[in-house]
UniProtKB/Swiss-Prot annotation:
Pathway: Cofactor biosynthesis; coenzyme A biosynthesis; CoA from (R)-pantothenate: step 5/5. ATP binds at residues 11-16. The keyword Transferase applies. GO terms for biological process: coenzyme A biosynthetic process. Keywords: ATP-binding, Coenzyme A biosynthesis, Cytoplasm, Kinase, Nucleotide-binding, Transferase. SUPFAM superfamilies: P-loop containing nucleoside triphosphate hydrolases. This is Dephospho-CoA kinase. Its main location: cytoplasm. It comes from Bdellovibrio bacteriovorus (strain ATCC 15356 / DSM 50701 / NCIMB 9529 / HD100). The lineage of its organism: Bacteria, Pseudomonadati, Bdellovibrionota, Bdellovibrionia, Bdellovibrionales. InterPro entries: Depp_CoAkinase (IPR001977), P-loop_NTPase (IPR027417). Belongs to the CoaE family.
Amino acid sequence: MKWIGLTGGIACGKSTVSRMLRTHDIPVVDADEIAKEVVKPGSAGLKSVIQEFGPEFLTADGALDRRKLGQKVFGHPELLHKLEAITHPLIREETRRRRRLYEDMGHKLAIYDIPLLFETRAKDQFDGVIVVACTKEQQKERLRRQNWSEDEIEMRIASQIPIQFKEQQADFVLHNNRDEQHLLREVDRVLKWLEELKNQN
């Protein structure tokens, strides 16, 4: 089974593209979804995170306050490393399980929706990489609409590898810098490319 990475800069529209691909019966494994699952209430992952960082990162209903924890660790490499040392092995294990499941079902191709594909040096694990790209100003505007502060926006964008580098490293670049009709046409281009990949030995 071909294993395709889907990534992009924050707020470039990767999740929207991921949803569109699902509607075409392409199996998608979502790294963010798995990252939430491995620290859900009652999980061993959540217990380990709280032991490391403290109970102030729990919400009133016992869930992990991901935004509060994110604000603490971003910009502090040693804290981010501690968090990733807990969560990354759990995420990898669950990812492998889902990938095997799709393979056992007979799929020829599956997508792994992973925001930090290049940051985690994972490119070599894939048979192809799709990058969803937009301009920096569009990233900022979309994050403002989600009520992010200017400091949060600057810090998060700065923590990621520049989108231009990701575009250079990609096997396929999908531009999400115009309207929805343009995005639909871009997704059609991706679907054709995936079909070609699927039929390669």
